[in-house]
Each structure stands twice: as C-alpha cells, then as structure tokens.
C-alpha cells in the first residue's frame, strides 16, 4: 500500500533531527508533512527544503497573524519556497495580505478558523459571542470572499464548510481537518475530533493526524492503518 496524499503527518517534534528520523521511519507510507511552530526556530525551513527536494509535499502551519503589511512581506518570501500550503489566521486583513503576496506561485493559503482544542465555553471565556460552529461559518464566508484557497477547521465543521463553499461555486475549496483520531487511538487534547473516514465523508480534502502515528511503537504501520481507513472514500 502506498501513501495517500490526503494524509498530512505533523512533525511536531522537539528537534529537526527528531523530525528527520521520523520521516525516515515512515518511509513511503507518508508523502505530505506539516512543519509547525515547534521547528520554526530550529531550521524548519531547511527541513522543508530538504523534504521538498526528496519529493514530499509540505504544509507550513505557521498561522501568520500580524498587521497586513507584515503578513504580506512574510508570505511573499514563503511563496518562493516551493512549499505547498501555508496557514494564516482567518481575519480579513490577514487573509487579503497573504493572497496578495502569494501571487501566481503554487503556494496555497489556508485560513485557520477555530482551533480544534477550543470548546464553546472557551470561546465565551475569550470574549466571543459565537459558538464554534457559528464562528467557523462566519470565517469560512470571509475566507471565500478574500480569495484564500481553503480553511482549517475541525472535522465537526467540515460539512458546514463544504456546503458553504459549494454554494459559493467553489467545490475545489480545500478543507484541512486537524483533530483526526482513528478509533483505536486516544483523543489527547482535541476537543472536536473525528475518525479519518468520518472527516472525509463530511467534506474534508486533507486530514492532519499526528500522535496516533508519530507516538506509535511502529509509526509506519500506524500510518498505513490510517491510509487503509481512508481508502475508498
């Protein structure tokens, strides 16, 4: 069985050397990797370039969030990296700046709607007058208006996001869902998790599945188990 390009494995590991070792262990079972903030300060871009050179796809999950001018300058540099996906926060000014900077490059911009670790109670505590579902709906509509390529949301809001995108005439809109947990794994700190099959049926285009794979005794075997769950959907 070969890798499924819809499966993204996050390299949320302490060091770049740890990440390289994990990639080696996973071998041909995984073709798409996410590099997040943990590796940003320790040559994460060097790792990204090396993985791209070896034929892997790369998701830079850096969640850019700053004034428009700063986001635009940062995204313009990243657009030359050859990486495939970049996250920004789902605020109109931020999304517009990233889309402008991306230009004609192959980099696709994803807007982060609501973190999968947050509950409705958390949002109230943060001062939002929305449930997670309502806030995701608002941000998906804003993301479509700003011209980003897709969004990041929990599997529980994937069907809503897909419906909104289809109604807007954008069936190709990307929906990347973290918080994917196979039935045989623990949920960890994901408050709104779902199985790989359920997330895909809800309309997700890509799944981010981390600890069930990277913390397994045999990461390659765990990755192939997830790929098997995804097969045919």
From Swiss-Prot:
Domain of life: Bacteria
MF terms in GO: orotidine-5'-phosphate decarboxylase activity
GO terms (BP aspect): 'de novo' pyrimidine nucleobase biosynthetic process; 'de novo' UMP biosynthetic process
Active site positions, chain numbering: 63
Annotated EC: 4.1.1.23
GO cellular component: cytosol
SUPFAM superfamilies: Ribulose-phoshate binding barrel (SSF51366)
One Pfam family named in its UniProt record: OMPdecase
NCBIfam families assigned to the protein according to its UniProt record, in alphabetical order: PRK00230.1, pyrF
Role of this protein: Catalyzes the decarboxylation of orotidine 5'-monophosphate (OMP) to uridine 5'-monophosphate (UMP).
HAMAP family, sorted: OMPdecase_type1_B
Record note on quaternary structure: Homodimer.
Protein name: Orotidine 5'-phosphate decarboxylase
